[in-house]
């Protein structure tokens, strides 16, 4: 599915350069509504910080407009991991957008080998209009909470 209308995304771990490039293409398309919420503690990690600094340097306006790095409304980690694309499909689960979250295949197509990393994660995709709308509203609320928290600090 190619996003053409909107992307609402909340991610705890966000250090996958390939997925980041896809997100940044969406950020650069001014016809797509795009809100990205990332956890403050996780975004401060070495890989995340480097990736996000590169995004901010390449497109400061796009980065400031679409990304919020913060915490939950209760001042805890923002641990939701999911998105809604075009108001049609949602996904939520425990998978971080990171090498260990997605699983790193050392041998093409086969798990295992020296350096293999993979967390035990789940990801559910859904298209029920009511579930998609409710999850999109939750992602928007989390984005606003992170913005408000950032403005206070």
Regions found by a protein language model. Give the residues of each.
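HKD-type phospholipase D/PLD-like phosphodiesterase module
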Residues: 1-2, 16-24, 28-153
